[in-house]
Amino acid sequence: MSVSTLPLAPETTTVSGPGAYAAATTASPAPAAAPGTPVQFLLGTHQPHWLTTAEVPLFVSDRRLRSYRTLPRARSPWALDSGAFTTLSLGHLFDPPKVYLARVRRYRDTIGHLLWAAPQDWMCEPFILAKTGLTLGEHQRRTVANYLQLREHAPDVPIVPVVQGWTSTDYLRCADLYLAAGIDLTAAPLVGVGSVCRRQATTAVHAILDCLHRAGITRLHGFGVKTLGLRRHGHLLTSADSMAWSAAARRQPPLPGCTGHINCANCPRYAYQWRQRVLGDIHARPASVQSALFDLPPAPVT
């Protein structure tokens, strides 16, 4: 099955053995994030129309926005998910980079307040690799190739690079692929970390984030961070997005006063209360273990 419209990156770009970033990890431990660091927590939502009223930063998928003839106008900053995980999970093809970029430009210019957009990256979870029939290294090469294409076609569009892998060494090798292409991730304003959202209860995720920090790649975005991940790894992230509230709401009855739906899986009132509760819980923790990631004002409950 062919799962890409992208040209393959040359095999010669594969980094074997310790590369530049791997060597950097032997220098010194990663510094802890300082309290008060200005960071962002993006509330994930399936409902793009929330952009018109939300007073908190949102994370919205291109797969949800692309069908809108009339786009909403954003009240607050937001970031765009490319929907790459769902695309690969379903065995679908990515749109050509220029087609994706045309949509991103439309969102930026019409919706406004766009912080950044994710690339069409290739996740490296074992079940995704089984679906595509490709190697982890090939997914990494395609991730880097897509970012380079997007940047070449639209240097004015804020696409963030994403590192993919499964082990700490994998992520450093992916970073070295970027470096071989002239992209120094230590200087990037933000770097996404992919293929971590389903294993945040493991020590592997902490090891990956710590390893990237020690390599000098410190401004990290965690995709799909769950509540436990927020508590354990928040101090190693500059930003994160989460839709954990929706899964929790699906397993519970609706909030008192919510009479229009059988659960609150798509309810902004529930989402804002969840966000406020999670932030309050993290802020209530001792200062020595409190995550600077969520040093944000509480969201209004509507």
Q: At which residue positions do the language-model features occur?
A:
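Generic structural signal of hydrophobic/aromatic residues within well-ordered alpha-helices
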Residues: 100, 104, 171-175, 274, ...
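Low-complexity, flexible helical/coil segments
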Residues: 72-73, 90-98, 114-119, 151-155, ...
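Short, acidic/turn-prone active-site loops that include or flank metal/cofactor-
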Residues: 64-65, 83-86, 195-198, 243-251
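Short, low-complexity, polar/charged sequence segments that are solvent-exposed and flexible
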Residues: 60-61, 78, 97-101, 136-138, ...
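Eukaryote-skewed repeat-based solenoidal scaffolds used as protein-protein interaction platforms
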Residues: 105-240
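Alpha/beta catalytic cores of nucleotide-metabolism and tRNA/nucleoside-modifying enzymes
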Residues: 2-52, 152, 180, 207-220, ...
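Non-catalytic, usually N-terminal nucleic-acid engagement modules in DNA/RNA processing proteins
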Residues: 2-145, 299-302
